Amino acid sequence: MLTPLATLPYRHVLTLPTEPSAVRIARETAELTLNGWGIGLQHPSIDPALLILSELVTNSIRHAAAHSPQVTVIYGAGRDRLVLAVHDTHPYRPPLDGTVVSTGAGGGLATVMELVLGLGGTAVVRADVMVGGKSIWITLPL
């Protein structure tokens, strides 16, 4: 189930150039933002969430930089859930199902899906009809 971002009391948006430093900045911003929201970094979902975020931003840099000069990271949280999204303007929407794991392609996405499903979360790829591209939305229980 996809949580509408507007229903979450905590939200933050970060737009970065699609370059390698974006991974570190997105992760550090997540740590600072979560801490500011009172979500301790020792929570069992946070380390996997940070790895998921790093993988998604890395994928945007590696596969979308030619089409997408920027990557946007969306952070959201409520009492019982954490939402992360990564948006780029590359038109390709990768599958987030068993084919990611079974074909061996998309190793980063296979890791993402293993972590998301292991935590009881959800992952959805949504097309962006306004500016093109897609967003990958991750929802994890807290």
Residue ranges with predicted function:
Residues P20, E55:
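Solvent-exposed, flexible loop/coil residues
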Residues V23:
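Primarily the active-site beta-strand->alpha-helix module of PP2C/PPM metal-dependent phosphatases
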Residues M1-P17, I61-L142:
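Conserved beta-strand-loop-beta-strand hairpin that lines the nucleotide-binding pocket
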